[in-house]
Curated annotation (Swiss-Prot):
Mnh complex is a Na(+)/H(+) antiporter involved in Na(+) excretion. GO terms for molecular function: antiporter activity. This is Na(+)/H(+) antiporter subunit A1. The chain crosses the membrane at residues 1-21, 30-50, 79-99, 117-137, 166-186, 201-221, 226-246, 265-285, 300-320, 337-357, 377-397, 427-447, 480-500, 531-551, 591-611, 623-643, 646-666, 671-691, 707-727, 766-786. The gene is mnhA1. The lineage of its organism: Bacteria, Bacillati, Bacillota, Bacilli, Bacillales. It comes from Staphylococcus saprophyticus subsp. saprophyticus (strain ATCC 15305 / DSM 20229 / NCIMB 8711 / NCTC 7292 / S-41).
Length: 805
């Protein structure tokens, strides 16, 4: 195991340790103990920049379950390193921010355990080269995010938001699992890099389209794309550090990472290009439109996050066009990848800061309701400055980093209309139109976000508590991000060669991509589009009160959230009715369903699959064997017609003893002896127990009841017999008995094969069987003791009553 493996597992290890630290040492805020972990990891991953800048990659392998294609292989390239730096870098700032946000009275041991669990899961997800391991970390992010969102579990809204996020993302995870299975079948491997190298082979597979659809569903649920975005707004009930971490820089970017990583495999399909682009643009438009009507600051940021994720998704879709061209023409569309990666970084900076400032405002005023806020400019000047910088960046206004990536976004959306491929030159006109409209509403909610908090009149009477500027410690993290917004806007070359180009090369499978960003490109279509966005946006802000009521009057039934809740209400009711049709509470009915299903499956398989029953190696039936079989059949048949329990027990014992005689004739005396002992003890116990039971009252079953029993019994007997004969006559592998014959002495140092198998070769199985018997015995002992205790209590109660009388 390499140092890279340790780096990925480090947060998971400390997630187990931190709760114990909190339990025994509470004098210092637990966050100070956690902070060094992401700091050390961030510094460690910075050391890989020189490697990825030179075009090299690193593969660290660790065998886990190679026979199942599950090896813990980690792969560091430009894309994985970018996400690792975001996860650990933003993680440092989040932990620092949480120290001032969460008081010591909170369950900090739980919080930081969940946070580190999530951090480790995200690192494993973005660095794993094995699809199965990636999926395990993918689901671990869903699980840990559920714990984080429901951290304040005394609030019903937190539980609701956590459940919704869990249901939607786990649904996507199951879809992703299906896609992974089909993809690994098509490519013959679970290694992502090997799959990329075998992309041409996968693209001719009949599983190609199905795996693509399933992978996209998984990615879109995780990154809150339309129509799966419904979980993200309700997830805002989490503590602000969680929202700032999960929903600005990490979890919601996991779907984008998956799309970027899978692009070299699926980019050949026009379905991939159109779906990723269209879904991204629809998400951008719909979420930005909904963000304008939100009354909660976190609600605004939630929908703005969804819209920004849609924007990045659309850029990844357009960038996939580059796989259909070569040379300079390909570089035109690779620029969309460049814009996507740059905006991925930019979004983490300005959105992370805005979430933290929202938490600061809530911490200061006691509310996030925009109707109660306003006029905080003079009261919270530092918070205002940070909000101004980051909101203008989100709006796409120079000289901030958001402007540069937004310009690249518009250029890519306009440029793709020139592609004579997949009808992009005709239907593609909708792409820049949708992008521009979505950008207009992005401008509107970004600018209004500033005014709703800090401008206007101060409404002291509406605030739960007197507003004040928050502590310097709470402002350090958003201040750092605000500074980065300015630095990356004025000096984008800091990121170009070191971070962006290696990441773009990893997505586009190239080595010569260039990332150049300029504040002014000339009088281009993108420039005029930006001017139009500003002008229309300002007009909409001025006339906001005249048109917003139209959005607020949107019928509830036209929202996806309404149908999600409807489905959640209806499903348990109808599923309960359906379950009641076959779960009746009677063991016999359950067994009928189980055996009937097995019989039907087996018979259908036998009918559609050719098989052969070979009797050539079957030994002759000896007379005494025939006699024993007749005895077994006779005894078993008589149990059916028995009129007393005693007779049934005797006949069942006769069957067992007859089978034991078989064991003797077939050379297994120890097994026969064991069978004799078991039968004798069982018979004695049954007789002792049934002696104390009331007489057997027979009741007449209906004819249909008996008929079903007969059909199931005969069917099960036929199926087992036929399958046994088929298995005997079709031996594709050597008998395992030869292994035991060869190694029973030299490996286990025993001469009795049956005993050696039970005690040595299958020792663990025997141990657990013994454990089951022990647990059953403890259960019986407990029931007897409880009954005796209750009997004594009843007697004591009677004595008390008599005394009182």
């Amino acid at each position: 195991m390499s140092l890279l493996h340790i780096a990925v597992l480090l947060p998971l290890i400390f997630a187990l340790i931190i709760p114990f630290v909190y339990r025994f040492y509470k004098r210092i805020h637990l966050g100070w103990f956690v902070l060094p972990i992401p700091v050390v990891l961030f510094i460690y991953f910075l050391s890989y920049i020189s490697t990825t800048m030179s075009g090299n990659t690193i593969m660290e392998k660790a065998n886990w379950m190679p026979h199942f294609g599950m090896n813990f292989n980690l792969y560091v390239d430009g894309l994985g390193l970018l996400f690792s730096l975001l996860i650990t870098g933003i993680g440092c700032l989040i932990v620092l921010y949480s120290i001032s946000y969460l008081s010591r009275q909170e369950q900090l041991g739980h919080f930081y355990c969940y946070l580190l669990l999530f951090m480790g899961a995200m690192l494993g997800l973005v660095l794993s080269d094995n699809l199965i391991i990636l999926y395990l970390f993918w689901e671990l992010t869903s699980f840990s995010s559920f714990l984080l969102i429901s951290f304040w579990r005394d609030k019903q809204a937190s539980i609701y938001g956590a459940q919704k996020s869990m249901l939607v993302t786990v649904f996507g995870g199951l879809s992703l699992l299906g896609g992974i299975i089909l993809l690994s079948i098509a490519g013959g491997t679970t290694s992502i890099q090997e799959l990329i190298n075998n992309a041409s082979e996968i693209q001719t597979s009949p599983f190609f389209i199905f795996s693509m659809i399933l992978v996209l569903i998984g990615a879109m649920t995780k990154s809150a794309q339309f129509p799966f975005y419904v979980w993200l707004p309700d997830a805002m009930e989490a503590p602000t550090p969680v929202s700032a971490y999960l929903h600005s820089a990490t979890m919601v970017k996991a779907g984008l990472y998956l799309v970027a990583r899978m692009t070299p495999i699926f980019a050949v399909s026009q379905g991939w290009i159109w779906t990723v682009t269209a879904v991204g643009l629809i998400t951008l438009f719909w979420a930005s439109l909904n963000a304008t009507k939100q009354q909660d600051l976190k609600g605004i940021l939630a929908f703005s996050t969804v819209s920004q994720l849609g924007m990045i998704m659309a850029m990844l879709g357009v960038g996939a066009v580059s796989f259909h061209f070569e040379g300079a023409e390909s570089q035109i569309y690779i620029a969309a990848f460049t814009a996507a990666i740059f905006h991925l970084i930019n979004h983490a900076t300005f959105k992370g800061a805005l979430f933290m400032i929202t938490g600061a405002v809530d911490h200061s005023t006691g509310t996030r309701d925009v109707k109660k806020l306003g006029g905080l400019l003079t009261i919270m000047p530092i918070s205002f400055t940070i909000t101004l910088i980051t909101s203008l960046s989100m709006a796409g206004i120079p000289p901030f980093n958001g402007f540069l990536s937004k310009e690249k976004f518009l250029e890519s959306m306009i440029e793709v209309t020139n592609v004579n491929l997949f009808s992009l030159d005709t239907l593609g006109i909708l792409i820049p139109i949708t992008a521009i409209i979505g950008s207009v509403f992005t401008f509107v909610y970004s600018i209004r976000f500033i005014g709703q908090i800090f401008l206007g009149s101060y409404k002291e009477d509406k605030l739960p508590k007197k507003a004040h500027e928050v502590s310097p410690l709470m402002l350090i993290s958003p201040s750092i991000l605000a500074i980065l917004v300015i630095v990356f806007g004025l000096f984008p070359a800091i990121l170009s060669g070191s971070i962006i180009e290696p990441a773009v090369n990893a997505i586009g499978q190239t080595t010569n991509s260039t990332a150049e960003f300029h504040m002014f490109h000339g009088f281009t279509p993108a420039f005029f589009s930006t001017l139009g966005i500003y002008i229309v946006g300002i007009v909409l802000i001025i006339t906001f009160s005249y048109w917003i009521y139209l959005l607020q009057k949107q019928p509830t039934k036209l929202t996806i959230n309404y149908w999600y809740n409807k489905f959640g209400d209806v499903t348990p009711r109808y599923s309960s009715k359906f379950t009641d049709t076959y779960v009746t509470g009677f063991t016999r009915n359950n067994l009928v369903i189980i055996f009937a299903s097995l019989i039907v499956i087996a018979l259908v398989t036998l009918l559609v699959t050719p098989f052969n029953i070979d009797f050539k190696d079957v030994s002759a039936i000896r007379p005494f064997e025939l006699i024993i079989v007749v005895l077994i059949i006779t005894a078993a048949s008589m149990i059916i017609f028995a009129k007393s329990r005693l007779f049934s027990i005797i006949m069942a014992s006769a069957v067992g003893y007859s089978v034991a005689i078989f064991f003797i004739f077939f050379g297994a005396p120890d097994l026969a002896l064991t069978q004799f002992v078991v039968e004798s003890i069982s018979t004695a116990l049954f007789l002792l127990c049934f002696y104390h039971l009331p007489n057997l009252n027979r009741h007449k079953e209906t004819r249909s009841f008996k008929l079903v029993n007969i059909v199931i019994s005969v069917g099960a007997g036929i199926v087992v017999t036929v399958l046994g004969l088929i298995a005997y006559g079709n031996r594709h592998f050597g008998s395992i008995a030869e292994f035991y014959k060869t190694h029973v002495y030299d490996l286990a140092h025993g001469t009795n094969m049956v005993n050696v198998i039970l005690v040595d070769f299958r020792g663990t199985d025997t141990l657990f069987e013994s454990s089951v018997l022990g647990i059953a015995g403890l259960g019986v002992y407990t029931m007897i003791k409880l009954r005796a205790k209750n009997d004594k209590s009843d007697e004591g109660g009677k004595n008390v009553e008599q005394t009182e009388e």
